Amino acid sequence: MNEQLQKESGGELAFKFYPNMVMGDEKDVIRKMRFGQIQAAGFTGFGLGEILPEIRILELPYLFRNDAEIDMVSEELYEYFSIALAKKGYVLLGWADVGWIYFLSNDPVAEPKNLHKTKVWMWQGDPLAEAFFKELDKSPVALPITDVLLSLQTGLINAVYCSPMAALVLQWFTHVEYISDVPFTHAMGAILMDKKAFEKIDASNQSILLEVCKSNLRSLVERSRIENQEAYVQLSMEGLEKVVSTVDQRLKLRLIGERVNERLAETLYSHDLLSKIDSLLVEYRKTDD
């Protein structure tokens, strides 16, 4: 992406990357963007929600059935969220993709009641996860993501949720025995740029930046999905046992998701936005079934 950006802008545009949380966690990065220390950054839904809470609607539990539904809704709402983020002082450069999120645990988790046997982690300060566990009447262990591995090692927690790739990269899989076969949500991400920094770029280069980022991020999403599929297989090869849910158990999970989605309407996002997404999915599924 950087090479293409430099080429098409005649060397006037380029990114300098700081990987692996060099600049701190997502809240730290947001703070540094506000002070002008960083001009652009990649965020998971957690960080995006700190900026624009309603964007977390794209990560509601059991909302999407497949990647195609995610792509359709994300594209339909791209302009909506671009405008909303601009009002907060950010430019949306493109969607990213963390992946489908599974439970990994030391006890099998096939349905909601199974979580009551676990000491399950919750990303500290995440209103979406908090609502999910509240609906289950389960008290999770709230921790920043940087404390999860040590907490697994010490036994403070024995269940986590993440994408297959994250389980491998963060080494969380080394302290659990099971992985669910049904993801409970999909985690999204995006690249944002400080609006003031963006507006300092001339109009022609703004167009180049937006086009290059969006197209390259689309390719990155496709690659990430393949890598997550491969990572799920790798986790099985590493000894994790897949927990297969029955049709009845899957239905229970979806009903939990629907209640959580309603619980968060008008606190995290509007009923109108939820209804719009529901309508988009209903129409899409008519043609897809």
Regions found by a protein language model. Name each.
Residues M1-E69, L77, L85-D289:
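N-terminal secretory/targeting leader peptides
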Residues F81:
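Basic phosphate/pyrophosphate-binding loop/patch that engages nucleotide-derived ligands
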